[in-house]
A protein has these predicted regions:
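FabD-like malonyl-/acyl-CoA
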Residues: 2-140, 270-299
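Cys-dependent protein tyrosine phosphatase-like superfamily
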Residues: 2-5, 221-229, 235, 241-252, ...
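Alpha/beta catalytic cores of group-transfer enzymes, especially the acyltransferase/condensing modules
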Residues: 11-13, 38-40, 100-251
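Short, flexible helix/strand-to-coil boundary loops that buttress conserved ligand/catalytic motifs
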Residues: 48, 144, 179, 284, ...
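Glycine-rich phosphate/pyrophosphate-binding beta-alpha loops
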Residues: 61-63, 198, 253
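Non-catalytic positions within long, well-ordered alpha-helices that form the structural scaffold/packing
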Residues: 77, 183, 264-267
Length: 308
């Protein structure tokens, strides 16, 4: 028997109108988004469904993404479809925690609201992220280390997304130097990302420390569905470890490709991307084309999947 994975995307896939069909037609999905509003004091439906300038600002993006992911997840499990294992990219790890049973939706919403604020506050001026396409990971790591040492500044790998796509992060000048070196070393392209800061770098450690304080009062429950953390690309065995990984995750590399490869090695053969956009499905095509990938963003996707 194969295994079904529920996987949850990170920020960057948000769009106005995300989740609206579920909110309008499914009472339980609506209740989840309304719970997010209650837990945060924000009008989540207005942020998600109405034209506004806030949805792309980190402190709002994160909670809105998680609310929609959790609402779609609720709609799926209401149909009796459950995961055998779960994972999420960066912010999406909180969706995975909900699906694993380790964190309640209410707690996840409250924590992620704070996470978004802390990450927004911690964003220093002069940070940047760049996607490096078509270069060996070890070469990129070596270039980042050499650049960091020579310039006495921060630059490192933020995301191992899929073969041929790695994101580097850090101080803008150092990221630019490293990107130029990657191009010289044979990278097909280096694409600066439109982000508000150097996420998943040492420059975000302050946000991680604040997050650790916020997590102190949160109860972590038994892990009922196995889940893999970005930090190690391995299963989290003990509830006691969850908070440490969530704290580290803010300033650590996201090992997404390694996570997916581990899941496939362990027998996973159906991957269900739950939430806005199709970024994870795109990565899957480059990691392994032989496994089944399902994208559930719109109501049409949902109905096709549950009625298959």
């Amino acid at each position: 028997m194969g295994k079904r994975v529920f996987m949850f995307p990170g920020q960057g896939s948000q769009y106005i109108g995300m989740g609206k069909e579920f909110y309008d037609t499914m009472p339980n999905a609506k209740a989840v988004i309304d719970l997010a509003s209650e837990q945060t004091g924000l009008d989540i439906p207005a942020l998600c469904f109405e034209e506004n300038d806030k949805l792309n600002i980190t402190e709002y993006t994160q909670i809105c993404m998680l609310a929609v992911e959790a609402a779609i997840y609720q709609a799926i499990i209401d149909k009796g479809i459950t995961p055998d294992v779960t994972a999420g990219l960066s912010l999406g790890e909180y969706g995975a925690l909900i699906a694993s049973g380790a964190m309640t939706m209410a707690d996840a919403f409250a924590v992620v609201r704070k996470r978004g604020i802390y990450m927004q506050e911690a964003v220093p001026t002069g940070g940047a992220m760049t996607a490096v396409l078509g270069l060996d990971p070890q070469v990129i790591e070596d270039i980042c280390k050499k650049t960091a040492d020579e310039t006495n500044s921060v630059v490192s790998v933020a995301n191992y997304n899929c073969p041929g796509q790695i994101v580097i992060t850090g101080e803008k000048a150092a990221v630019d130097v490293a990107a130029a070196a990657c191009s010289e070393a044979g990278a097909k392209r280096c694409v600066p990302l439109k982000v508000s800061g150097p996420f998943h770098s040492a420059m975000l450690k302050g946000a991680g420390e604040k997050l650790a304080d916020a997590l102190e009062s949160v109860e972590i429950h038994d892990i009922k569905v196995p889940y893999i953390t970005n930090v190690t690309a391995d299963y989290v065995k003990s509830p006691a470890d969850v908070k440490d990984y969530l704290t580290q995750q803010v300033s650590s590399s996201v090992r997404w490709q390694q996570t997916i490869e581990r899941l496939i090695a362990d027998g996973a053969d159906e991957f269900v991307e739950i939430g806005p956009g199709r970024s994870l499905s795109g990565f899957m095509r480059k990691i392994n084309r032989d496994v089944k990938v399902v994208k559930i963003d719109k109501l049409e996707d949902f109905e096709k999947y549950v009625n298959r």
